[in-house]
């Protein structure tokens, strides 16, 4: 071992003094013991508080294969455990003592890095399995044993994912788990019968609490269940059949990647364990060589790069360029492409799989050797870093003492020597990574005309010198471009961008000008682009992105030229520039039904307990998806109806996630309302009104939401801080509103308007389903019934969904006097026109003026309210287009009229979308849409005149 540096010698002297103060002046520590104690505050603190652990270390020093005895050692500790509180304490103390032993052996070089990873994984598996088995017996005593239809007892199987599954867990880590049970059935032999899903859900909840909950003794592991089917919104535990259905029908590529390392905890070789393995294997490894995965892997590469930029991970040895994540990624590339045909590539552990990659000739021997050496180097460094304070971090320290600890632990004389070796390893990884999934975009700088654009940027050209580059523009347009360039240079000079930033900008601008100058709209495009660049010019990373990825620059120019809204959005939130890297997804947004899955994957990178990061990530996801939708709109890939569909499904996915987050927060604080033990779902639903309810959201639409609950009055929550059940739901709704409206650096999520609830702003924020029905039957105004035409459940359990649909149908189908209805609808429209109507006669307000969109909506609402009593099927849809279709189908309105109104409606909405992209108001010249407006006026006179 190297001698201790000056900083570590000082630390060692302080430790001797501390131990003598707490354990007596005769307390003696050997030089080896001081080495370890000086390298880790965690070990030092633990041995001070538990001196008997030091005695055990001296009597029984750690050995490499002692992980095989963990289960027996822990079982001895659990013999005296009588309740869950004692269980939690025993698990936490066992973890801490064992981590001290692992850190001890690691610091003294008594175990290799691979052996250390195996010990850490074995410790986690032992704690998980022992806690599960103890709690399973306890739950069986309470509720009986879960059995299938034949009376065979059913176990809880646990899949360890990620590094835990691969036997490569780091020192201070989350654990990713998935719970499953073989078959449905009921419990037998208990005081009350439960179905198996309920039993295993409760067992899973208790297991998570036993491992995850912070107590005076700390926690065992942070448990992350988000890799399970449907993530947070899915059931905690699923049967084998449900798992198989999900992965066969809905499993995504990224879930295949996650499943590569999945391993059953407990090493079971029983029939149920083998059945689960067989169920999952076809999903993970395809029988053919799967080159289709390359594009998905390119997307993942982009995600890694974006992660580094988003979180400023320059010194991160896991996620930074050439870090641990890239080594894992390289190995998985070959597993996923060829694993179905090459059994040697189906292993969970990285190094043996990497060795197999080399033996199959898929990487050069020197590449495999370099990658293996880099992996072991980085994993040892990661573990030493985390062992300092038992903290989950992969960021190199700024603190001089911690730097000295790592240099000594890695066998280097000083910090700079360690950094030199680290840089060598990470560059070797990055070279293989880039070679494997490269981006071969041509370099604009190779264009023979490049020097002209270089001069345009660097030199103060005259208008006549610009003419050869822009022969299609007139003199005024050229003068405008030269002014824009000069003003941009002047503004940049006032910013502090440093020599590196200046160099990158000087590379970027000729490339940008080479693409902008040939455009017909060059002056406008250049103005928008320079305004955007000015907002990011001090953030060199983004300038480098545009230099490195020619395609990204091209897409940026195209989108900014087409839409000032997009340009301004990119200026405000430069993170969105990352979206330009993937043209395949930029102009083709995800399938409307895939937003939930995409959002779930996006949020997996964010710690569940970090609210600030989750709020930020939600906003970033929304902005990125809206950019894609706008790009599809601009390119013509998405017609207006599809634009609104995408914006609506995006909002619904976000509503799901926000309600889930609010629910998790409330349950952690108060527990769940007790009546949920007797019913499916959560007793809570969100109704979408207006544009959300009608699948007609625009780019800047707010959300009209109403909350309803199903909870008997006497119910309380089951947490330590128990509150009234209905109070729980009120706070849940308030929490939802808060999560939507909180302003982060990425702005708010959506403006939410809850004033359409019963009694409006004066009413309760959340209503019981009975109160909602009573209000609609007895107190609601006609305009509130009009609003109900465009209402639907956008989030909620099936029972409330069904109840709301019944209420809505009954209200809309009430017999109404047509003359009275006409008068009330006309009066409401007149009020709106007086309040919101356009006062400029030379302009036409597409939405609010006579013959516009609101008139069309009122005609649709009048027809539903007036004729649904005779034809209840008119209540089926909440969007205007399909309402007019129903009117024609059921002979309420002539087909030609319905088609004409639909055409007018879609055409005007299309114009509003495009005006929004141009950041224009919804007012246009009074002569436009003359035919459409005439049709709307005629229909208004016919039905409501």
UniProtKB/Swiss-Prot annotation:
GO terms for molecular function: [glutamate-ammonia-ligase] adenylyltransferase activity; [glutamine synthetase]-adenylyl-L-tyrosine phosphorylase activity; ATP binding; magnesium ion binding. Residues 450-945 are annotated as: Adenylyl transferase. One of its GO terms (biological process) is regulation of glutamine family amino acid metabolic process. InterPro entries: GlnE, GlnE_rpt_dom, NT_sf, PII_UdlTrfase/GS_AdlTrfase. It catalyses: [glutamine synthetase]-O(4)-(5'-adenylyl)-L-tyrosine + phosphate = [glutamine synthetase]-L-tyrosine + ADP; [glutamine synthetase]-L-tyrosine + ATP = [glutamine synthetase]-O(4)-(5'-adenylyl)-L-tyrosine + diphosphate. Its cofactor is Mg(2+). The keyword Nucleotide-binding applies. Its EC number is 2.7.7.89, 2.7.7.42. Keywords: ATP-binding, Magnesium, Multifunctional enzyme, Nucleotide-binding, Nucleotidyltransferase, Transferase. One of its GO terms (cellular component) is cytosol. Residues 1-441 are annotated as: Adenylyl removase. Belongs to the GlnE family. This is Bifunctional glutamine synthetase adenylyltransferase/adenylyl-removing enzyme. The lineage of its organism: Bacteria, Pseudomonadati, Pseudomonadota, Gammaproteobacteria, Enterobacterales. The gene is glnE.
């Amino acid at each position: 071992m190297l001698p201790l540096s000056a900083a570590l010698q000082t630390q060692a002297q302080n430790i001797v003094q501390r131990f003598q103060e707490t354990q007596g002046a005769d307390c003696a520590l050997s030089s080896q013991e001081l080495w370890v104690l000086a390298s880790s505050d965690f070990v030092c603190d633990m041995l001070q508080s538990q001196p008997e652990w030091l005695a055990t270390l001296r009597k029984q020093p750690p050995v490499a294969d002692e992980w095989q005895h963990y289960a027996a050692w822990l079982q001895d500790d659990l013999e005296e455990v009588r309740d869950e509180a004692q269980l939690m304490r025993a698990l936490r103390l066992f973890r801490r003592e064992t981590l001290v032993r692992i850190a001890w052996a690691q610091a003294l070089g008594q175990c290799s890095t691979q052996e250390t990873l195996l010990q850490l994984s074995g410790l986690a598996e032992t704690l998980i399995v022992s806690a599960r088995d103890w709690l399973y017996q306890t739950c069986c005593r309470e509720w009986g044993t879960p059995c299938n239809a034949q009376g065979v007892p059913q176990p809880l199987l646990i899949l360890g994912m990620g590094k835990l599954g691969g036997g490569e867990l780091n020192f201070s880590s989350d654990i990713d788990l998935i719970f499953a049970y073989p078959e449905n059935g009921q419990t037998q032999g208990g005081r009350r019968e439960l179905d198996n899903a309920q039993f295993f859900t409760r067992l899973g909840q208790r297991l998570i609490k036993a491992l995850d909950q912070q107590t005076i003794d700390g926690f065992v592991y942070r448990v992350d269940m988000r890799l399970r089917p449907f993530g947070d919104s899915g059931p905690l535990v699923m049967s084998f059949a449900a798992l198989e259905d999900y992965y066969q029908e809905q499993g995504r590529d990224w879930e295949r990647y996650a499943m590569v390392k999945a391993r059953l905890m407990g090493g079971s070789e029983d029939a149920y364990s083998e059945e689960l393995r067989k169920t999952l294997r076809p999903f993970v490894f395809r029988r053919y060589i799967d080159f289709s995965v390359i594009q998905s892997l390119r997307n993942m590469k982009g995600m890694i790069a974006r992660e580094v930029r988003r979180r400023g991970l320059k010194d991160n040895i896991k996620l930074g360029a050439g870090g641990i994540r890239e080594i894992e990624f390289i190995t998985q590339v070959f597993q996923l492409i060829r694993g179905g045909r090459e059994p040697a590539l189906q292993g969970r552990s990285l190094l043996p799989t990497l060795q197999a990659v080399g033996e199959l000739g898929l990487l050069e021997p020197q590449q495999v050797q370099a990658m293996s050496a880099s992996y072991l180097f980085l994993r040892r460094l990661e573990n030493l870093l985390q062992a300092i304070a038992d903290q989950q971090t992969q960021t190199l320290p700024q603190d001089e003492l911690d730097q000295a600890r790592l240099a000594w632990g890695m066998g280097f004389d000083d910090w700079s020597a360690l950094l030199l070796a680290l840089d060598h390893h990470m560059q070797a990884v990055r070279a293989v990574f880039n070679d494997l999934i490269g981006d071969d975009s041509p370099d604009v700088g190779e264009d023979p005309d490049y020097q002209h654009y270089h001069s345009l940027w660097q030199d103060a050209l005259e208008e006549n010198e610009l003419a050869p580059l822009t022969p299609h523009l007139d003199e005024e347009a050229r003068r405008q471009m030269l002014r824009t360039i000069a003003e941009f240079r002047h503004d940049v000079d006032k910013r502090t961008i440093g020599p590196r930033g200046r160099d990158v900008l000087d590379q970027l601008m000729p490339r940008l000008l080479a693409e902008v100058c040939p455009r017909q709209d060059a002056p406008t495009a250049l103005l928008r682009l320079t305004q955007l660049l000015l907002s990011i010019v001090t953030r060199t990373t983004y300038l480098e992105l545009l230099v490195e990825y020619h395609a990204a620059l091209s897409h940026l120019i195209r989108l900014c030229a087409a839409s000032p809204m997009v340009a301004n959005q990119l200026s405000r939130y430069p993170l969105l520039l990352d979206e330009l890297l993937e043209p395949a997804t930029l102009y083709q947004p995800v399938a409307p039904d895939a937003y939930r899955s995409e959002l779930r994957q996006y949020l997996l990178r964010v710690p569940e307990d970090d609210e600030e990061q989750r709020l930020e990530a939600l906003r970033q996801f929304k902005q990125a998806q809206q950019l894609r939708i706008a790009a599809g709109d601009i390119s013509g890939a998405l017609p207006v109806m599809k634009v609104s569909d995408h914006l609506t499904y995006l909002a619904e996915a976000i509503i799901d996630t926000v309600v889930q987050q609010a629910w998790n927060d409330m349950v952690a604080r108060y527990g769940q309302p007790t009546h949920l033990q007797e019913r499916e779902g959560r007793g809570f639903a969100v109704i979408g009104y207006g544009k959300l309810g009608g699948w007609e959201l625009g780019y800047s639409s707010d959300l009209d939401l109403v909350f309803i609950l199903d909870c008997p009055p006497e119910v309380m929550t089951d947490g330590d801080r128990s509150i009234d059940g209905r109070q729980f739901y009120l706070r849940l709704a308030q929490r939802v509103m808060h999560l939507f409206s909180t302003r982060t650096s990425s702005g708010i999520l959506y403006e939410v308007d809850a004033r359409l609830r019963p009694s409006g702003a004066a009413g309760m924020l959340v209503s019981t389903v009975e109160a909602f029905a009573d209000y609609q039957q007895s107190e609601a105004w006609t305009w509130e019934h009009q609003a109900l035409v465009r209402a639907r459940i956008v989030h909620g359990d099936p029972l409330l969904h069904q109840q709301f649909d019944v209420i809505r149908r009954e209200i809309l189908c009430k017999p109404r006097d047509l003359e009275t209805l006409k008068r009330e609808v006309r009066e409401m429209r007149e009020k709106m026109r007086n309040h919101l109507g356009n006062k400029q006669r030379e302009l036409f307000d597409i939405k609010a003026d006579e013959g516009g969109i609101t008139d069309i909506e009122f005609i649709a609402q009048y027809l539903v309210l007036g004729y649904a009593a005779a034809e209840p099927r008119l209540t089926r849809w909440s969007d205007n287009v399909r309402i007019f279709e129903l009117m024609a189908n059921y002979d309420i309105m002539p087909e030609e009229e319905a088609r004409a109104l639909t055409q007018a409606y879609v055409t005007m909405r299309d114009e509003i979308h495009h005006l929004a992209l141009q950041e224009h108001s919804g007012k246009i010249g009074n002569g436009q849409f003359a035919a459409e407006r005439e049709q709307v006026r005629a229909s208004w006179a016919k039905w409501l005149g």
